[in-house]
């Protein structure tokens, strides 16, 4: 992290099919080793499966899933007087969205035996219903922040 000046925020251009910045962020996180066309293919196939399963606009389901997995608070370690405290902090909206996408994709990558599009579809549908492992991760983070709210006075 530079001490001189803050980095400018890059503007994410929306994806070509759904014209959504959220889908583009999902594709960028999904991409491995620069294979963006493969990431697009996986994402769009997953969204088609979501549309078939729910008979709704897949963009609405994806937005709902990411919103349900987005954390409101997180804990960061802060060292004060020789001891380390887990200090709860509010999460900025962009960071919350990035964390939600990262958690959804990490859950998909941990599962084995099915194609990535099928795993992503299942996790998006689960997260949209407010269940699934990504939402459970968010709940664990919230519980940890709630347990350590006595240390909120040590916020940065």
Curated annotation (Swiss-Prot):
Which is an annotated Pfam family here? Ribosomal_S7
Q: Where in the cell does this protein reside?
A: Plastid, Chloroplast
Concerning CDD domains, the annotation shows: uS7_Chloroplast (cd14871)
InterPro entries from the entry?
Ribosomal_uS7, Ribosomal_uS7_bac/org-type, Ribosomal_uS7_CS, Ribosomal_uS7_dom, Ribosomal_uS7_dom_sf
GO CC annotations on file: chloroplast; small ribosomal subunit
State one molecular function term (GO).
Answer: structural constituent of ribosome
Q: Which domain of life is it from?
A: Eukaryota
Taking the record's annotation, the residue ranges forming a coiled coil are none
The GO annotation for biological process reads:
translation
Keywords attached to this entry:
Chloroplast, Plastid, Ribonucleoprotein, Ribosomal protein, RNA-binding, rRNA-binding
Question: Assembly and interactions?
Answer: Part of the 30S ribosomal subunit.
Family statement drawn from the similarity comment of this UniProt entry = Belongs to the universal ribosomal protein uS7 family.
Q: What does this protein do?
A: One of the primary rRNA binding proteins, it binds directly to 16S rRNA where it nucleates assembly of the head domain of the 30S subunit.
UniProt name for this protein: Small ribosomal subunit protein uS7c
Gene that encodes the chain: rps7
């Amino acid at each position: 992290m530079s001490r001189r000046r803050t980095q400018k925020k890059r503007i994410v251009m929306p994806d070509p099919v759904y014209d959504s910045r959220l889908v583009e962020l999902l594709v960028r996180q999904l991409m491995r080793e620069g294979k963006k066309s493969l990431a697009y293919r996986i994402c769009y196939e997953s969204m088609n499966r979501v549309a078939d399963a729910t008979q709704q606009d897949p963009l609405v389901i994806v937005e709902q899933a990411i919103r349900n997995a987005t954390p409101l608070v997180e804990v960061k370690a802060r060292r004060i007087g020789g001891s380390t405290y887990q200090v709860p902090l509010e999460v900025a909206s962009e960071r919350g969205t990035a964390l939600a996408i990262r958690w959804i994709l990490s859950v998909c990558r941990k599962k084995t035996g099915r194609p990535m599009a099928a795993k992503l579809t299942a996790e998006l549908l689960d997260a949209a219903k407010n269940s699934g492992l990504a939402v459970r991760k968010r709940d664990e983070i919230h519980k940890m922040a709630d347990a350590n709210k006595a240390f909120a006075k040590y916020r940065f």
